[in-house]
């Protein structure tokens, strides 16, 4: 049996149906590797030492490892969805704890950020809209959030600008 990682299906996930009905999306092994590397670099190169550069995937000779638990991710994306699956793989790859919630509400998000000192959140634009419109935001300490990643749909420049006000450098 010959194996071609660039072309071989690793899994089928589902789209959100933004442009119609949800569709099965074919993800190859290389799709997963590329997405994991892309997001790991976005997160500052914090990677799991046992897998770091085992196959020469990164250009840098070394990357900083997690020093204690100073990073916590928040995700409520369905794990059967492409974006949700990739976020799970990223959390495993970077050894980052994740707060995973089955149901979203702005208050549950704010409560989790304050309680667990969430530093990063994987979200979609409709979630961001709900968060920035919520009057509850001012009742919680959200200072731990350093950055957000949005995907699966268009993110307007205006919404991006508002989100920058909620993230600390």
Go through each PLM region and give its residues.
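Structural detector for helix-capping/boundary residues
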Residues: 7, 29-30, 77, 116
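Phosphate-coordination loops involved in phosphoryl transfer and adenosine-cofactor binding
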Residues: 6, 69-70, 145
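Conserved AMP-binding A3 loop
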Residues: 3, 10-41, 46-54
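Conserved AMP-binding/adenylation subdomain of ANL enzymes
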Residues: 33-72, 79-119, 134
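Conserved G/P- and acidic residue-centered "switch" motifs that form tight phosphate/ATP-binding loops
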Residues: 18, 95, 152
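Short beta-strand->loop structural element characteristic of the AMP-binding/adenylate-forming
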Residues: 1, 23-26, 75, 97-103
């Amino acid at each position: 049996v010959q194996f071609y990682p660039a072309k071989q299906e690793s899994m089928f996930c589902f789209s959100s149906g933004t442009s119609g009905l949800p569709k099965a999306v074919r993800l190859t092994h290389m799709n997963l590797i590329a997405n994991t590397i892309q997001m790991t670099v976005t997160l500052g190169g914090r990677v799991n030492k046992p897998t770091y550069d085992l196959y020469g995937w990164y250009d840098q000779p070394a990357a900083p490892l997690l020093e204690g638990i100073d990073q916590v991710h928040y995700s409520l994306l369905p794990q059967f969805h492409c974006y949700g699956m990739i976020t799970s793989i990223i959390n495993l790859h970077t050894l980052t704890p994740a707060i995973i919630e089955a149901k979203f509400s702005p208050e549950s998000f704010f409560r989790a950020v304050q309680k667990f000192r969430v530093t990063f959140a994987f979200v979609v634009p409709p979630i961001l809209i709900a968060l920035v419109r919520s009057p509850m935001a001012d009742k919680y300490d959200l200072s731990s959030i350093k950055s957000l990643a949005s995907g699966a749909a268009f993110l307007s420049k205006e919404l991006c600008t508002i989100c920058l006000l909620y993230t600390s450098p």
